[in-house]
Swiss-Prot record:
Domain of life: Bacteria
Family membership noted in the UniProt record: Belongs to the PsaJ family.
Encoding gene (name): psaJ
This protein's name: Photosystem I reaction center subunit IX
Regions that span the bilayer: 7-27
Amino acid sequence: MKHFLTYLSTAPVLALXXXXXXAGLLIEINRFFPDALTFPFFSF
């Protein structure tokens, strides 16, 4: 039971860190390549 409670306390922390890193990566990509996500849809 102790290991299960440890898992419940660390999994949200790891998910938050992964989500923050993914969001930071998208922010940095959009800083260097602005409108890269919408550019192919409006290039006609």
